[in-house]
UniProtKB/Swiss-Prot annotation:
SUPFAM superfamilies in UniProt: BRCT domain (SSF52113), DNA ligase/mRNA capping enzyme, catalytic domain (SSF56091), Nucleic acid-binding proteins (SSF50249), RuvA domain 2-like (SSF47781)
GO cellular component assignments: cytosol
Role description: DNA ligase that catalyzes the formation of phosphodiester linkages between 5'-phosphoryl and 3'-hydroxyl groups in double-stranded DNA using NAD as a coenzyme and as the energy source for the reaction. It is essential for DNA replication and repair of damaged DNA.
Gene Ontology biological process: DNA repair; DNA replication
Domain spans labelled BRCT: 598-675
Protein name: DNA ligase
Residues annotated for NAD(+) binding in this entry: 36-40, 85-86, 118, 141, 178, 298, 322
Catalytic residues identified in the record: 120 (n6-amp-lysine intermediate)
Entry-linked HAMAP family: DNA_ligase_A
Names of required cofactors: Mg(2+); Mn(2+)
Binding annotation for Zn(2+): 416, 419, 434, 439
InterPro entries found in the cross-reference section: BRCT_dom, BRCT_dom_sf, DisA/LigA_HHH, DNA_ligase, DNA_ligase_AS, DNA_ligase_CS, DNAligase_adenylation, DNAligase_N
Record organism: Acaryochloris marina (strain MBIC 11017)
Alphabetical list of Pfam families matching this protein: BRCT, DNA_ligase_aden, DNA_ligase_OB, DNA_ligase_ZBD, HHH_2, HHH_5, Nlig-Ia
Length: 675
């Protein structure tokens, strides 16, 4: 290793500081200090010096954004603070409803909290963690509670500082924001992919998400992702960093720390002003160098935000007001019919591909016979399609003046396209159904549902393998899955020993899934995962559930008459009773391990919040234990919170609990309460 001269050491430090200052001016202030060519020259000088003296390389050096060894996989990590998505509004009526709702939850405000409006960037959400001023982790949104750690890739984004622009940083700080691709960069990426013989990305959002999950950070660096910050969480104030009291102050703090914040934001005193901002940008946004699909509205006062807290999915103090979806005209080329696991025949319009909200769309559901009649659909019709919520394509209307001569109205098939048996439509339903219990399409759909993550979670059994199992008649019921072995699976096309062993192991493991998952996996009409949980809480064994009628089931809070009757009729069907017997013989769980009728309700009436990482219990385990003992677990601290269970790296919930004088429990304290 070369000996470093004092002059070279000083030069490295000077270059580092100058390049960091230039990056902050360029990305944080939109005020470049130097030409790109000058920056590049200084950057390469630093690269050369660090190559000569590797001992001088530091994690926050600008050179460390690129060139790390490709990752082999991404690790799932728990978010310190949940990274929630936002509730959507699609018109002023939705906005008024939201505004009335949060006002009712905080009726005694001394003054209005105000609003901050920001453009909703069409990209991928990131959570950035800084410790003592240094970037230590970058994480995707994931499911909101856990995301994938992609720190190597995040470090390549030039608008994300590796070191905070502050002399006395807090112990930890978390920033949330949106990674995105500018339109020019996106177009260049697609041109490069075409030249390389690769498929184009459908839209900038998909390209950004795919880029962030690249295993090679050099590829990420080449694609020039950008980043706007919009939320900050701070462990505590420091000598030169005060805790923001408003959302507007939080954005200014982010700028001060070196982050790029979207300049097109505004403080508003009323919904009328929010409406003006929304209307102003409805057309101006089309001239922006990046895509935006709406406006994010947040209450400005952070104290009111804390008081309102969160639902299970969204913050109550923020909402995304989406712009109307794009519409396009196209011609229906054919209508195909899909058969679902419940036997429902769903017509799907196949049409000439069109661009909608930045994506290519070539098909859309027509729902059912009534919807087809309402639209008066003919094969060959020119129709207007749009994306409902800018996600699901739908046929909005027909342009009959463009209908070709001789076109015939489309009629739903009278026979199932999968099995050929007669299709029926009950008077009480708009849906046409196949009622053949042996229909291959119904069986295939039932199996795919059974093995899905929310049900029995049988890893390795994807749609292709399920299709082979049903086509070969190796599996004609979900119970047949539990008679499979490696030798049988090896008869399938492209099945290797390793995969066969994995599938057999996953099938065996699925026998330990709890009763509520088994009930959900059975695919009873109208019984989703939440309803399955409610049913098993009230009927902890399958025998208990089979012994009651629909009227009794309907007395469960949250279970209506239609759901109750569907459950009752399913369990009265002889073939379903035989299925239950076979699954019981295979060893699946049809009894709750701990039922509410026998578990002591020692925590009844108590409300808990869990924060940080517990020593031995996973958060879901602790939550379940509290609920089994009659307690309630919420996601935010309020004056109604009885206890806060505190683990390592506890965040702002602990700070708020301390300010409210709420009792704090360790994991050991919680376990003692449960005894």
């Amino acid at each position: 290793m070369n000996t470093v001269s004092s002059s070279d050491q000083a030069r490295v430090q000077e270059l580092r500081q100058l390049l960091q200052k230039a990056s902050y001016a360029y990305y944080g202030l939109d005020a470049p200090l130097m030409e790109d060519a000058v920056y590049d020259q200084l950057y390469h000088e630093l690269v050369d010096l660090e190559a000569q003296y590797p001992q001088l390389i530091t994690p926050d050096s600008p050179t460390q954004r690129v060139g790390e060894r490709p990752a082999t996989q991404f690790v799932s990590v728990q978010h310190r603070i949940p990274l929630y998505s936002l509730e959507n509004a699609f018109d002023r009526g939705d906005m008024d409803t939201w505004d009335e709702r949060w006002h009712k939850l905080v009726p005694n405000l001394s003054q209005e909290p105000g609003y901050v409006t920001e453009l909703k960037i069409d990209g991928s959400a990131l959570a950035l963690t800084y410790e003592n001023g240094l970037l230590v982790r970058g994480t995707t949104r994931g499911d909101g509670t856990k995301g994938e750690e992609i720190t190597q890739n995040v470090r390549t984004i030039r608008s994300i500082p590796l070191r905070l622009n502050i002399e006395h940083p807090p112990e930890w700080l978390e920033v949330r924001g949106e990674a995105f691709l500018g339109l020019q960069v996106f177009d260049q990426i697609n041109r490069d992919r075409i030249q390389a013989g690769e498929a184009e990305f459908a839209n900038p959002r998909n390209a950004a998400a795919g880029t962030l999950r690249q295993l090679d950070s050099k590829v990420v660096a080449e694609r020039k992702l950008d980043f706007f910050a919009y939320t900050i969480h701070i462990s505590g104030p420091t000598d030169d960093l005060a805790l923001p009291q408003t959302q507007w102050q939080a954005l200014e703090t982010l700028k001060q720390l070196g982050f790029r914040v979207n300049p097109n934001r505004r403080q508003c005193e009323s919904l009328a002003e929010v409406q003006t901002y929304y209307d102003d940008w409805s057309l101006k946004r089309l001239d922006l160098p990046y895509l935006t699909d709406g406006v994010v509205i947040k209450l400005d006062n952070l104290g009111v935000q804390d008081e309102l807290g969160f639902t299970q999915k969204f913050p109550r103090w923020a909402i995304a007001w989406k712009y109307p979806p794009e519409e396009a005209a196209t011609r229906i080329e054919q209508i195909t019919v899909n058969v679902g696991r419940t036997g429902a025949l769903t017509p799907v319009a196949e049409f000439k591909p069109v661009q909608l909200a930045g994506t290519t769309v070539s098909r859309a559901t027509l729902h059912n016979r009534d919807r087809i009649s309402e639209l008066d659909i003919h094969i060959g019709d020119t129709v207007v399609v749009r994306k409902a919520g800018e996600i699901i394509p739908e046929v909005l209307r027909v342009l009959p003046e463009l209908r070709p001569a001789g076109a015939q109205p489309y009629q739903m098939p009278t026979a199932c396209p999968s099995c050929g048996q007669p299709a029926v439509q009950l008077e009480t339903e708009a849906v046409t159904r196949c009622v053949n219990a042996s229909c291959p399409a119904i069986l295939r759909g039932s199996l795919i549902h059974w093995v899905s993550r929310g049900a029995l979670d049988i890893d390795g059994l994807g749609e292709k393998i399920v299709g082979q199992l049903t086509d070969s008649q190796m599996v004609q019921s979900v119970a047949d899955l539990y008679e499979l072995n490696e030798d049988k699976l090896m008869d399938l096309d492209r099945m290797g020993t390793k995969l066969a062993r994995k599938i057999v192991s996953a099938i065996a493991t699925s026998k330990q899934q709890p009763w509520h998952r088994v009930l959900y996996g059975l695919g009873i009409r109208h019984v989703g995962s939440v309803n399955a949980q409610l049913l098993t809480e009230n009927y902890p064994t399958v025998d208990a559930l089979m012994a009651v009628d629909g009227d009794k089931i309907a007395t469960i809070h949250g279970i209506g008459p239609e759901i109750a009757q569907s459950v009752y009729e399913w369990f009265q069907t002889p073939t379903n009773q035989t299925l239950i017997q076979r699954l019981q013989s295979a060893g699946l769980q049809f009894e709750a391990i701990v039922s509410e009728s026998t578990q002591p309700q020692t925590l009844s009436g108590k409300t808990f919040v869990i924060t940080g990482t517990l020593p031995t219990l996973k958060r879901d385990q602790a939550k379940q234990m509290i609920q089994d003992a009659g307690g309630k677990v919420t996601g935010s601290v309020s004056k109604n919170t009885s206890y806060v269970v505190v683990g390592a790296d506890a965040g702002s919930k602990l700070t708020k609990a301390q300010s409210l004088g709420i009792n704090q429990l360790s994991e050991a304290d919680l376990l003692a309460l449960l005894q």
